Amino acid sequence: HWLALHGSSGGKAARVGDSKRRRMVKTSHHDTLGGFFLSHPPIRKIRVDVVDTSHPLTKGLPESFEVIDEPYMIEIQHPSETQLLLTAELGPDDSALDTGFVYDKDTALLPDGKTRVLGYIRRVGKGGVTYIALGHCHSPASQNRLSAAATTGDRPAVLRNTWESEAYIQLLRNAIEWGVG
């Protein structure tokens, strides 16, 4: 079983015309992963909803928890082979037109028009992939991307909020235990 985190849903970015904008390019690893990164809005506070608290991967997690993270917009590649673990009501992408990556249609929204997938399991043969979109970290070099909505005071020089969350640490422990068990 493969455990994939945050940035593994990305890959190649192609320049769009003469602009500085880029568009993500699907490759064969997205088929195996079962997810494709379209773009991301700015870093913000996110309420993560646990879809199934009885699954071994979500054992011990609350029904929801909050983190400050970069909300990846993940297009699910094989919905019929995918079990959702984590979601968030983030709604349509409200990023300014000059930020993020270019995409034709927001295919990362679930049918309700407001929910996005932040974690899932995809069965592949006798194994599978667990993907968790959470886990963004940043340093002073990228601090300007921190959304004002995410802070209540001074902006931190280093952001690793998700990695300091008890729920996220439990999720990673569960994923490792489940993957090797």
Q: Whereabouts are the PLM-identified features?
A:
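Amphipathic alpha-helical interaction segments
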Residues: G10-G11, K45, M73, S80, ...
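Helix-loop-strand module that forms the ligand-binding subsite of alpha/beta enzymes
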Residues: H1-A13
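Glycine-centered secondary-structure boundary/capping sites
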Residues: A4, L33-G35, G181
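Extracellular ligand-binding/catalytic regions of CAZymes and related secreted enzymes
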Residues: D94, F101-G181
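Residues at secondary-structure transition points
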Residues: A13, G17, P41, S139-A141
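Residue-level detector of flexible, active-site-proximal loop/helix-junction positions
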Residues: S9, G91, H136
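Catalytic beta-strand/loop cores that center a nucleophilic Ser/Cys/Thr
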Residues: G17-A133
